[in-house]
Amino acid sequence: MVQRSKSSANWLREHFNDPFVKQAQKDGYRSRASYKLLEIQEKDRLIRPGMSVIDLGAAPGGWSQVTSRLIGGQGRLIASDILEMDSIADVTFIQGDFTHDEVLQRILEAVGDSHVDLVISDMAPNMSGTPAVDIPRAMFLCELALDLATRVLKPGGDFLIKIFQGEGFDVYLKDVRSKFDKVQMRKPSSSRDRSREQYLLGRGFKGA
């Protein structure tokens, strides 16, 4: 029999005792992450019917489920992740590593000549538990997401991204502030207390 590590056993115990995990199962959401977006939506009203949205780091689909329901049949949602994701009606899914140019090009092709209203990203690298390694990896993904957002957002569009406090955060925040009229931080109650994650919200894209 394989012996579970203490940290693995603790994670499993926390996961199955997590009220948001239980609520997600009850509500039919694919992950507890749905409640993070729902809480931000309740406060900021980011997502509206008929919007065009890109969802990065989408698998298993918790944010895409919420977004698809809110934008309705007249909206458009392009989702992407390195992992597979079970299909969601009317959602265009692009599987691949977002750090590869080929995947970026596929997303840009899906957007086409039009622009989008909102880019959301719940991307995170595989965490090693060593901040000196994990934070730079996470910031690299944030930089790539911001680069995409500046290419595809309409003037006045919005940007929501998961970010971790650490080296490079202040420079990144300054960069986002230069591109958006208003920038705020969000820490949903459904985000675990011990997690360093926060969500950075940029409203009112100034244009490329």
Curated annotation (Swiss-Prot):
Q: Where in the cell is it found?
A: Cytoplasm
A single GO molecular-function term is:
rRNA (uridine-2'-O-)-methyltransferase activity
List keywords of the entry alphabetically: Cytoplasm, Methyltransferase, rRNA processing, S-adenosyl-L-methionine, Transferase
Return the InterPro entries for the record: RNA_methyltr_RlmE, RNA_MeTrfase_FtsJ_dom, rRNA-MeTfrase_E, SAM-dependent_MTases_sf
Q: Name one Pfam family in it.
A: FtsJ
Which spans of this chain does the record mark as coiled coil? none
Keyword Transferase in the entry? The reply is yes
Q: Its domain of life?
A: Bacteria
Identify the GO cellular component terms for this protein: cytoplasm
- Which catalytic reaction applies to this protein? uridine(2552) in 23S rRNA + S-adenosyl-L-methionine = 2'-O-methyluridine(2552) in 23S rRNA + S-adenosyl-L-homocysteine + H(+)
What EC identifiers does the entry list? 2.1.1.166
> Where, by residue number, does S-adenosyl-L-methionine bind?
61, 63, 81, 97, 122
**Catalytic-site annotation from UniProt:** 162 (proton acceptor)
Record's function text: Specifically methylates the uridine in position 2552 of 23S rRNA at the 2'-O position of the ribose in the fully assembled 50S ribosomal subunit.
Which PANTHER family does the UniProt record give? Answer: RIBOSOMAL RNA METHYLTRANSFERASE, RRNA METHYLTRANSFERASE 2, MITOCHONDRIAL
Q: Which family does it belong to?
A: Belongs to the class I-like SAM-binding methyltransferase superfamily. RNA methyltransferase RlmE family.
The entry's protein name is Ribosomal RNA large subunit methyltransferase E
Organism source for this protein?
Pseudomonas putida (strain GB-1)
- Report which gene this protein is encoded by: rlmE
